[in-house]
Amino acid sequence: MKKKILIVGGGTAGTMTANNLAKKLMPEIERNEVELAMISDSKNHYYRPGAMYVAFQKAAGHEFIRDQRSLLMPEIDFFVDPAIEINVKANYVKGKSGKRYDYDFLILATGCEVAAERIPGLAEGGDWFYSYEGAKKIAEKFAKIQSGRILVTVNFPKTPNVPHQCGIAPVETTMMLHDYLTERGVRENVEIVYTYPTKAQAVENGLFLQSPTSKVLPTVFDSVRVKHETGFTLARVDPENKIAYSEEGKSISFDILMSTPPFQAAKVIRDSGLSKALDNEGWLPTDKKTLKVIGLKNVYTLGDTVDLPVSKAGGTIHTQTDIVADNIAAELRYGYPTESYDGKVIAVAQMGLTCGMPLWYDYQEDVQPTPCSKLGSFMRLGFNKGLYWAAARGML
């Protein structure tokens, strides 16, 4: 009987995994033994990290959007039909259209979403770069500011040891902001204040979620005159008076609030009953090695949806996708998964407009900070403008 593999989500995780599966299972597909299908809530594919460049007017945004169908191998059936129900007992997902998508193997790659409403006043008084709409809004403010204070805040999920989306992004954008304001000739008149919560995964009273990087950041920030303060866990924002208040009892006024807002899993995941995350955040309980949803034999997950202590970023997905694809292929062929995820993350951080820093880590080793360089920035920009689309197609 033909086996059906269903991928829910047309972002980086879903697209890479679908294409990798199509390649690995081509013999079975050609023998009509396997069927691959993807459902997504959009006909478009968005390269999410591109929004960061829009915030500093280094990109317009349209260059980071492609037709989703064009990124998928022809062997993959694609449907624009937002998932509204997941039934793991009967092995189906229901779309908004009412159509039922049956599966033998399910891959949940639904990502995460901004949940600014979780902090009172943040939606009204804050800005962020985690969406193209948000990036365009904050870009207008950055382009107009002549003097004052830009406050940077970072929020973590309530669920222990789960990071926010793209852990290095607040540092990247703080450094990019310094360069951008310098380009505009107003840096001397604009104060940048970078804050970090008291508790950030395994780190307390630091400036980053991993200790080695946290220890070097004060020197990095001091070199570009960025003020920094730990122990500032954002609790609420007064949008009218432009004041941010922390759980620790501190308050900081601002002219622009650039925040890493709270995040949560997609609504279909939060409504599924599969998550054990705190505060209905929706992160899926994930086996750290196989990337299966814990307790479910035929359901995998990867990317921003998981509850693992690794970055919710493309550099993580790039290594996870092979594990998921290889394990499903092995289960079909041998009856059991064969690969184990080691927590590896590989990326290049944009540490300013013209400086890039390669970074890598896994479950055993934290990021070891390395010098940033123009070559690193060239690598990152090259990936943004071309190599990403090859990676999404499963070619890298």
Predicted regions and their residues:
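Beta1-alpha1 glycine-rich phosphate/pyrophosphate-binding loop at the start
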Residues: 1-77, 161-206
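FAD-binding core/adjacent interface of flavoenzyme oxidoreductases
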Residues: 1-3, 76-183, 258
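Glycine-rich, N-terminal phosphate-binding loop of Rossmann-like dinucleotide-binding domains
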Residues: 10, 97, 110-111, 154, ...
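Short gly/ser/thr-rich secondary-structure transition/capping motifs
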Residues: 18-20, 88-92, 132, 237-244, ...
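A Rossmann-like FAD-binding core segment of flavoenzymes
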Residues: 33-37, 76-86, 178-281
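FAD-site-proximal beta/loop scaffold in flavoenzymes
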Residues: 124-146, 252-256, 260-319
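Rossmann-like dinucleotide-binding core of oxidoreductases
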Residues: 146-223, 227-229, 313-343
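C-terminal, flexible cofactor-proximal segment of oxidoreductases
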Residues: 325-396
